[in-house]
Amino acid sequence: MQINIIETDHEQIENYINGHASNGHEIFGPIPYEDGYIFRVYAPNADQMFIKGDFTNWENHQMSKNPEYGYFYIYENAKIGDFYKLIVVKDGNWVEHTDPFARAMDHEGDFASLIVDENYNFNDDEFVKNRSKNFDKPMNIYEIHIGSWLRYGQNVNFLDIVDKLIVHVKEMNYTHVEIMPVTEYPFYPSWGYQSTGFFATSSRYGRPDDFKKFVDILHQNGIGVILDLVAVHFANDYYGLKTFDGTHLYESPYEGLTYSEWGSINFDYSKGHVRSFMKSSFAYWIEKFHLDGIRVDAVSYMIYYNGNENRGVHEDNIKFISDLNKTLAKKYPNVMLIAEDSSSYPLVTNKNSDQGLGFDYKWDMGWMNDTIKYFEVDSFNRSMYHNKITFSMFYFYNERFLLPLSHDEVVHLKKPMINKMNGDYENRFKQLKVLNTYQMTHPGKKLNFMGNEIATFDEWNENESINWDIKNYPVHDDFNRFIKDLNCIYKNNSAFFANDYDENGFEWIIVDDANTSVFAYERRAENSRFLVVLNMANMYHGGYEFAYDEDLIFVEKINSFNPKYGGAKNDYREIEIRKGEVLRLELWEYEAAVFEILKKDEKTN
């Protein structure tokens, strides 16, 4: 059956080729039409293209080519559930490929593309209507890997874990779940960061409708969903995007630019159709799956050639990132765009400058590295590393930072968080409570990887479930309870989030006492004021003094040595001081304490 409806799409296709489109998924791939599907594939340099699948009895059907716009097309009596493949012919070479715009595919075996039902009906209107970028709201992100959060054998479906995940997230007072990539990928140990299907939900976790339902159910329970997407590179498998039309269609032809350090292939954003392809991918996931945020992986490898600052800024990529973020911000103004960027490139979260990349948030890798380094050092030598704690606030207001303790820090012999702490078994738990208090009360939004909340002693392994049984040990159960309560205090007190990016929201009270490694600071918002005291050394203080020039009452809200967390400080303190008096606190070794600061009339009320 010959249908020539494609002629009506030429303006859209021209926009796509020129890099101006974010709706490529509505133009290419399998498009429903009458009782079947139209298949369109952009491959300008291919000599011929064939399609075969369940609907052709796996016989080759030749596709027509529009030579002016460089795409192939065909109508087939295909239906939902049919698998298919493309055969691309160039200079006599016949190569089977997956459809770049396939919505699903087989991740193993014969890597065929799959036609799926795309008419899922969401029930999350209220949540989507009220969501925001959370600049002045609490955002405490729980990062998970679908396949190993709770593993039931070889493969885990989204819907296998969703009910238990919701219970855990709500109980722990997290606000969002961030999901490591679920775009289709062939090599499981890549964790999804080397993809072959930029519009396909990985079949190892279910079909697209399963993921949509997963997001929908989370939204109905008040939980936001952020997805990791990869824009810097794609998998090196021959059947994916690699030399798709017999030429370097998606990648650079120049030696030194094609391959990344991981052996994957870098996207070439000097090409208009590549820009449109990736903008369309981002738009597809946001629009079709109701995502609340996208975390863009390895941004530093886009900013600089293969992430090497000595090779200079990659101007084509800079322009693309800025264009991508402007496009998405206009189409989806309440969806967050988050950069995982380890570079010192400026203006990552700036939307006004020509050089600004336009992200909403940037991971603070400097804070993460400095903090971990500090806690790895022996307590008695920490005075020499004092600036590892103080330095973050020197640059914090340059960007809109998010504080991550992510999967990258607990894998490949880097050790789990508990084993990064210096000292013996007992003192590691004490220090990890201090570190988490520091993270949750420091300005900036928060992220923790699954397992951090129970102080697991295991490095993360994508082939194994988190060892939840460890909570049967009192010390881990106590730690988990502390994290839950700490998260609750963060979530319910505006001082800890409303003014994250306003310099008036933070003030050091004790910042220069390197000899004792005691730090103290206030967090403030309208009608909300707190004092955070952190003893980061194995040193007891019978009466550590803080000068205040006000009549105040200090009401302790959480202390890491409370008996409910395995400690022996029985009563939370309430201390009243008059103007000119000092606040005097007993501080135990590795103690974290958070006080609400009230004036007398506030206490009375």
Briefly describe each language-model feature range.
Residues 128-136, 145-291, 295-313, 585:
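Substrate-binding/active-site clefts of carbohydrate-active enzymes
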Residues 1-38, 58-143, 148-153, 160, ...:
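The feature marks proteins involved in alpha-glucan
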